[in-house]
């Protein structure tokens, strides 16, 4: 169990208020002792909100393994009936996580203002996997899975007082923050969309941090970042997990400095990604100023449709978008293959990105929730299970569509509407989740793509793809142009498959 040696110092049930200078700056219990003038032999004491009979005690003296409030699960020790609030619960990830956590006996609450539904509607598109109204989803979750979700319709930016009241009511022990606009193209449409995304994402998160400081400072924040914060440095510098490792050194002329623990450089690739970088600094500073605790989840591109919970009944399905604003690349490729649109590669298609399946992303989030950071700790994980060139992904989708489902799939290169390097080095470091949190991928790329074909080829869903097929090819250019991209080349599939298989033999992926 990855978290068995964690202590009450990590636990959100700890009550430090009035016992120590909890709002002091610093990053560790040693700093607490130093600031309070405590000698090594002195005790740092706290109380437990769940076990008041303990009175004042040393929070380092009880581990999760020893505490009766923490029970074994397949993902580590979990706090009994842990209260988790999901912000953005109506979305692709939020709804999936709510059902996933509910099935593990977490007490799930959530908020949403249905922005995602409205943004996709603005594009003229819809989720190709039909989803119900929230009231019907909540009823189905209770009826099918026995999960009761406490939901409120709240805009976290513009209805902060409502959010305050809900947090005071629920007293969440962890908050998962998915309530941001997650689209690079949406942020590049025009000045109004760019300003909206910056305001919605950055100020919404900043307001949340102040509420956590005032209401639930012992709770942990699991904040969704993005691998896109790092960009794709042409120097080939590794994409470390948010901060430089302890032994990293900066050399200049005849001098050198330690970089250990410093935030790594960011090179965002859209105004959306800029908003995520600003979030990173705001969350980092809040942990430093107020002893909040947070994990920044630098997530790769998520793909897929399956978890046991969303597959249990059509009413429990999560959304799946394929339009140019909100459709992610693998999801879009599968939809294109099904309705006969050549899979679209931007430019050369040699861009490399990190990816993770929906089910594995849920596993990762669970492991982070039940392994809270220490007070004042800002932790970062790069949440991916592998990385691939988009060209290789197109071939993988085409092969499965052709060999398993009898589809005639083509691949095309189109103009790249984005400002990005087509060919670049890419060395992501993604060690924290497996080494510190016990994560092991449970589903292969090919298996999840196969599942997607199975679902999206159902007649009703295929028809929904057909209805919105004209919204797949991009018209939003980083330059501000408003026109559909032109085709540069139709790639000969058999030659591309042969090239791909030779590459697999040499490199392994």
Predicted regions and their residues:
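Cysteine-centered metal-binding/redox modules
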Residues: 1-73
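N-terminal Rossmann-like NAD(P)+-binding domain of SDR-like oxidoreductases, especially those catalyzing
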Residues: 73-306, 503-509
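C-terminal substrate-binding subdomain of Rossmann-fold SDR/epimerase-dehydratase oxidoreductases
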Residues: 103, 147, 337-509
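Short-chain dehydrogenase/reductase
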Residues: 205, 209, 283, 330, ...
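Glycine/proline-rich active-site loop of Rossmann-fold NAD(P)-dependent oxidoreductases
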Residues: 277, 290-292, 304-331, 341, ...
